[in-house]
Every structure is written in structure tokens, then in C-alpha cells.
């Protein structure tokens, strides 16, 4: 347990990761002083794990916040932090992986990442990040060569560990068939309204840590949902336990053996989100949550194409498997 009360999880590679991280996706203040100050405040109140990505366009502000936190003495060294970033799909080609990671390091003003993840199980034609992806740019990913390049990034010391995001059991099997270094993390949507039971069991059997995103329904994202925050079941449990709905949702994820990333720029909620580790949901609480109707919030529509590797959401998520 760290001094901020956040437990440390030992990944299969042996490195330790804070169980709770601050997400940096879909902020409304990208690249602004406010965004940097929010990251700085998060460090001040106790966050030590930050989850970013090339596609989030938040790496530079996070890097500035880390540098300022060091200058202010909020942290004594970069080693106190756990920094995750992600490989964007347009760079998911064997010869572009290392340059993409090095670009993320330049943005972050860091010498190494703690964790580097493949953002999606699909590639795009090489080029700059764009919000509207042309359908003819969507390509199948060569898991073997892209993962080998990820392994090289770890071997060279530019990242301490490697993993994936949004991979189904089937896609993990394909990737691991050619892997020399197995992925240590699979970051996916997981919440009381999307339990991911089969995927959790598969990842546990293969020593892959699930990191949950959209734990509160990604309500600030264009595809977000109020299903978690408006859940009557979660509200009833929260009132009975003297907690917030957000805390109940986050605690449920943690009690499933998963780590999680959440995002808030509100100092009060930042502090509240850290307070989920000194209490437990009861067996009765867990039983009620198990009965909540299930639905996916995140959409892969922007990566679907009649000529691409995945034509439907079902194919992308392998939900019929």
C-alpha cells in the first residue's frame, strides 16, 4: 500500500503498478493551462498512475505537469510515477512502433514509459492522427510483427512493460501465439453495467491484468452513457453504505481483481475517487450488482469498414464467441 492509500499490483512481469490511475482521455480543455493544472493537482492529492495516449493529445500537458511537480517537490523523482501511453493505430506497423513510442517520450519529456499499450486491435494507413478516419484507411493488424516491435521497445528499455487495449479473448489468443513477451495488461471497458466475466476469466488464467476504463460510463465522451451513474441499484447501495455511486462502481471493479483508470478535473472528486480501498462491498451488495442489465458503452464504429478487418461491432468485440 502506498502512502496515498492506493494498493500496488504486481504485474506478471514483476513490475508494480498502482491499482488506480488518472485517465486523460476526452478532456474538454486539451493542451491548455487548465489541463496541466488538473494533472498537477492530481499529483498533489496523491495520484501516481497516469494513463495517456498519442490519440488523447494530452501527453505534452502531462509532461509539463510532471516537470513542474518535480520542481515544486510534490514528487522527489520520476520513478515515483507510473506512466502509461498507447500506440495509435496509424503507427501500428512494425517499422513505426519504436518511432511512435519515442515521440510519446518527447511529448512527455521522459526517458521511459512504465507501460506501453496497443490502443486498438486494428491498424490504419500511416499518417497523422485525424478525428474522422476514412473507411479505406482501416487495415488488419499484423499482430506478429507489431507485437515483435513492442517487445523490442521493452528490450531497449524505452518501456518497462507492454500490453494491449480493447482486445477480446480471441484476439489475445492470436497475439499470444506469436509473443515472446506476453502482454501484462488488457485495458478494456468494465463497470457494473459491463461485467466482462468471460474476458476477466481468460485474462486471469493467462496472467494478464485487466485495467478498466469507462468505469463510470464515460459520461463526458461523445459515446458515453448515464447507465452507471443513474443506476437505481448502485444508488441504493451508495446511500446504504454512505458512499457515492462513483465509489461503489469503482469499488466493484477493484473487488473483481481489476485495476482501473478514472478521470476528473474536480479536486473534490479526485480525492473521493482515491477513497475506495479501506472498505468493501458486502456479498449482498455484489449479488445485487450482478443482476444489473448489461450493455456496452464504448463503440468501435469508427474502426469498422465494409473493406476492413471488422465490418460489425460483433466482429470487433467477438461478442458472439
Curated annotation (Swiss-Prot):
Entry keywords, A to Z: Alkaloid metabolism, Cytoplasm, NADP, Oxidoreductase
Region (Disordered): 300-321
Tissue specificity annotation: Latex secreting cells (laticifer cells). Expressed constitutively in all organs with highest levels in capsules. Restricted to the parietal region of sieve elements adjacent or proximal to laticifers in roots, stems, leaves and carpels.
Residues at the active site: 56 (proton donor), 119 (proton donor)
Residue sites binding NADPH per the record: 27, 51, 187, 214, 216, 264, 269
Temperature-activity profile: Optimum temperature is 28 degrees Celsius for reduction (forward reaction) and 30 degrees Celsius for reduction (reverse reaction).
Molecular function as annotated in GO: codeinone reductase (NADPH) activity; oxidoreductase activity
InterPro entries, alphabetized: AKR, AKR4A/B, Aldo/ket_reductase_CS, NADP_OxRdtase_dom, NADP_OxRdtase_dom_sf
Reactions catalysed, as given in the entry: codeine + NADP(+) = codeinone + NADPH + H(+); neopine + NADP(+) = neopinone + NADPH + H(+); morphine + NADP(+) = morphinone + NADPH + H(+); neomorphine + NADP(+) = neomorphinone + NADPH + H(+)
Marked site (Lowers pKa of active site Tyr) residue numbers: 86
Metabolic or biological pathway, per its Swiss-Prot or TrEMBL entry: Alkaloid biosynthesis; morphine biosynthesis
Annotated signal peptide: none
Biological role: NADPH-dependent codeinone reductase involved in biosynthesis of morphinan-type benzylisoquinoline and opiate alkaloids natural products. Reduces codeinone to codeine in the penultimate step in morphine biosynthesis. Can use morphinone, hydrocodone and hydromorphone as substrate during reductive reaction with NADPH as cofactor, and morphine and dihydrocodeine as substrate during oxidative reaction with NADP as cofactor. Converts morphinone to morphine, and neomorphinone to neomorphine.
Family: Belongs to the aldo/keto reductase family.
Name assigned to this protein: NADPH-dependent codeinone reductase 1-3
Organism (species): Papaver somniferum
Gene transcribed to yield this protein: COR1.3
Amino acid at each position: 500500500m502506498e502512502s496515498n492509500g492506493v494498493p500496488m499490483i504486481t504485474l506478471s512481469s514483476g513490475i508494480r503498478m498502482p491499482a488506480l490511475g488518472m485517465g486523460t482521455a476526452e478532456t474538454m480543455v486539451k493542451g491548455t493551462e487548465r489541463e496541466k493544472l488538473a494533472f498537477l493537482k492530481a499529483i498533489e492529492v496523491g495520484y501516481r498512475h497516469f494513463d495517456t495516449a498519442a490519440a488523447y493529445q494530452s501527453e505534452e500537458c502531462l509532461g509539463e505537469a510532471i516537470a513542474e511537480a518535480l520542481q515544486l517537490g510534490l514528487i522527489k523523482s520520476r520513478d515515483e510515477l507510473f506512466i502509461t501511453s498507447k500506440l495509435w493505430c496509424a503507427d501500428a506497423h512494425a517499422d513505426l512502433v519504436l518511432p511512435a513510442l519515442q515521440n510519446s517520450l518527447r511529448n512527455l519529456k521522459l526517458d521511459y514509459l512504465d507501460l506501453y499499450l496497443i490502443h486498438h486491435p486494428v491498424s490504419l494507413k500511416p499518417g497523422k492522427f485525424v478525428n474522422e478516419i476514412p473507411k479505406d484507411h482501416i487495415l488488419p493488424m499484423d499482430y506478429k510483427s507489431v507485437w515483435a516491435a513492442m517487445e523490442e521497445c521493452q528490450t531497449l528499455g524505452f518501456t518497462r512493460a507492454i500490453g494491449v487495449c480493447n482486445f477480446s479473448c480471441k484476439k489475445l489468443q492470436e497475439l499470444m501465439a506469436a509473443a515472446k513477451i506476453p502482454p501484462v495488461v488488457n485495458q478494456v471497458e468494465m463497470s457494473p453495467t459491463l461485467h466482462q466475466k468471460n474476458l476477466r476469466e481468460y485474462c486471469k488464467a493467462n496472467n494478464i491484468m485487466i485495467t478498466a476504463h469507462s468505469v463510470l460510463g464515460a459520461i463526458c465522451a461523445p459515446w458515453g452513457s448515464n447507465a452507471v451513474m443513474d443506476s437505481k441499484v448502485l444508488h441504493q447501495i451508495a446511500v446504504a453504505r454512505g458512499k457515492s455511486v462513483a465509489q461503489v462502481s469503482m469499488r466493484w471493479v477493484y473487488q473483481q481483481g481489476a485495476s482501473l483508470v478514472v478521470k476528473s478535473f474536480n479536486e473534490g472528486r479526485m480525492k473521493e475517487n482515491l477513497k475506495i480501498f479501506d472498505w468493501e462491498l458486502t456479498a449482498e451488495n455484489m449479488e445485487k450488482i450482478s443482476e444489473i442489465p448489461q450493455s456496452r458503452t464504448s463503440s468501435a464504429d469508427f474502426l469498422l469498414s465494409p473493406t476492413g478487418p471488422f465490418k460489425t461491432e460483433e466482429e470487433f468485440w467477438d461478442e458472439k464467441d
